[in-house]
């Protein structure tokens, strides 16, 4: 797929769609064990690292003794606040009044903490859409030079 011009990250996402979900037998239990073993590592390390690396922050701006300049520091904090904190706050601050004024309801088995986790996913999803958009812009620019 990579030779066809599709980015390797998108190739892996497409391949992941073909991972079997409902399998009967011994393979199912071993696959579930592997999934349960790796889930915390993936959820709390790999996915946040992936989102951070694709958020547009260049690690060359970081130094062991601090950050190079105040303008770069402001840029980095702006990106972090906008991509991560801003999406969560926006979703929560927009949804809370609707539930409070009974314009809509949370599902019966949903708490505000669970809803907040969905708000986090909303921020991550937007960041991933920016990543995919940047891949497409790079591909379009490369095709125009041919």
UniProtKB/Swiss-Prot annotation:
Instruction: Please give the biological process terms from Gene Ontology that the record holds.
Output: regulation of pH
Q: Which terms are listed as keywords in the entry? A: Cell inner membrane, Cell membrane, Membrane, Transmembrane, Transmembrane helix
Its placement in the membrane is given as: Multi-pass membrane protein
The gene is nhaA
Its GO CC terms are: plasma membrane
Q: Any transmembrane segments, and where?
A: 44-64, 72-92, 115-135
Family to which this protein belongs: Belongs to the NhaA Na(+)/H(+) (TC 2.A.33) antiporter family.
Q: Where in the cell is it found?
A: Cell inner membrane
Q: Which InterPro entries match?
A: Na/H_antiporter_dom_sf, NhaA
Which domain of life does the protein's organism represent? Bacteria
| A GO term, aspect molecular function | sodium:proton antiporter activity
Which Cys pairs are S-S linked? none
- What is the name listed in the Swiss-Prot or TrEMBL entry for this protein? Putative Na(+)/H(+) antiporter NhaA homolog
Q: Name one Pfam family in it.
A: Na_H_antiport_1
């Amino acid at each position: 797929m990579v030779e066809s011009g599709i980015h390797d990250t998108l190739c892996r996402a497409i391949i992941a769609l073909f991972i079997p979900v409902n399998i009967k037998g011994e393979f199912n239990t071993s696959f579930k064990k592997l999934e349960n073993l790796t889930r915390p590592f993936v959820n709390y390390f790999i996915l946040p690292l992936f989102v951070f690396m694709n958020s547009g922050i260049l690690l060359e701006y970081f130094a062991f003794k601090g950050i190079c300049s105040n303008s770069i520091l402001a840029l980095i904090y702006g990106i972090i606040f906008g991509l991560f904190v801003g999406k969560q706050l926006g979703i929560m601050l927009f949804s809370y009044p609707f539930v409070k004024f009974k314009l809509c309801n949370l599902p019966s088995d949903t708490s505000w903490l669970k809803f907040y986790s969905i708000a986090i996913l909303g921020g991550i999803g937007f960041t991933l859409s920016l990543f995919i958009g940047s891949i497409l812009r790079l591909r379009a620019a490369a095709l125009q030079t041919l």
